[in-house]
Amino acid sequence: MILITGANGQLGTELRYLLDERNEEYVAVDVAEMDITNAEMVEKVFAEVKPSLVYHCAAYTAVDAAEDEGKELDYAINVTGTENVAKAAEKHGATLVYISTDYVFAGDKPVGQEWEVDDQPDPQTEYGRTKRMGEELVEKYSSRFYIIRTAWVFGNYGKNFVFTMQNLAKTHKTLTVVNDQHGRPTWTRTLAEFMTYLAENQKEFGYYHLSNDATEDTTWYDFAVEILKDTDVEVLPVDSSKFPAKAKRP
């Protein structure tokens, strides 16, 4: 049986629809059905479901809030929660697929130079630090794991940059978007398919990096221009100093 955590998030939802299309059986849980910060609750669900495969999509992703008011919740979900899931997965003999982030790196490589799986992590934010701790806990407690680092995730469900731009375009004729932060967007469908590909084909356990194919990095400005290309909204590039953020972007 397959178990999906964070099943109501944008990735968890995409994964559910993908498995539905394939007529695969699974159990989908979110915080109401299994609060991952509660070890007893996690163990109870695992004992009932008896999963052979766990897609751990649950995560705290409010990167700026994690620097202050959300710091405790960030740690509880990304560290304690991941530890609980990893321990339960190992106890019940399940393969664990854990979704991580580019925030585990410092983000100081030259533009266009990719981060490799064996590059040294050096998170610069609370969110990045808790996700890195989650990676270490998965590696510590699970003997059968896939850790997938991804970036700039967007899709048809949940909050993401695409929806934000589309919503702003309904009420603005001009939008300013930062043009000095570089990365590669990742579609939730691509990520969900890659997760299932690794697990179903029993690929080598370990770390993987995934984003959508691109000949070169893009910026949030470039991404916004592409999103709104069929509208009358003017998109203007600005320096990130115009939008101060609590958390440093990699």
Predicted regions and their residues:
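SDR active-site strand-loop-helix element
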Residues: 5, 29, 54-58, 96-102, ...
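Mid/C-terminal beta-alpha module of Rossmann-like enzyme folds, strongest
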Residues: 194-195, 201-246
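NAD(P)-dependent short-chain dehydrogenase/reductase
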Residues: 136-183, 188-197
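N-terminal Rossmann NAD(P)H-binding glycine-rich loop of SDR-like oxidoreductase domains
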Residues: 1-21
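NAD(P)H-binding glycine-rich loop region in Rossmannoid oxidoreductase-like domains
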Residues: 40-77
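NAD(P)-cofactor binding segment of oxidoreductase domains
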Residues: 54, 68-97
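Adenosine-cofactor binding site in Rossmann-like domains, unifying the SAM/SAH pocket
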Residues: 20-44
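Catalytic helix-loop patch of NAD(P)-dependent Rossmann-fold dehydrogenases
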Residues: 76, 80-84, 91, 104-148, ...
